[in-house]
Amino acid sequence: IFLACIALGTAAIGAVNTVADGIGKSISAQGQSILGGDIGFELVQREATADELKQINALGTLSQSIGLRSMARLPDGSDQNLVELKAVDNAYPLYGALKTLSGKPIAELLGNANGTYGALGQQILFDRLSLKLGDKVLLGDGTFELRAILTSEPDALSEGFGFAPRLLISTDGMAATKLERP
């Protein structure tokens, strides 16, 4: 029995080391796509100062995003749903690919057309609010047209667990919501 326990313990340690090595190699090979860049800086409840942005810009190409939870409301007020709101700039994503069912360029999907910014939502949001492409939702003071179903974000793994469906908008669209307060 003693020798069986030693053999079992040795096999378990070997298996754990093999799995850990595989995970490490995978992260090394796909780290940029998982993170969405080479380095990630996160600020909580404040914007980067001009000096901080200058220092970060000196490191290479910069992409900024804003994340928060908000309520997406139907224009008639009949329903609403909590969303993980993410606003991205024109450089997003630096690495990897944002995937939608439409396949159109992100700038076209999120841009301002006739005074309304675009938004990309996960299928579960469409299902919960009985939405279809072209429908509008309200976020804060802004109105957004749902232009595509979001299927994959390159940096989603680095952002941890979400409590609600993702809704992706542009940083210009975020300014229209007036959800950011000093």
Residue ranges and their predicted role:
Residues 1-182:
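Alpha-helical transmembrane segments of bacterial inner-membrane membrane proteins
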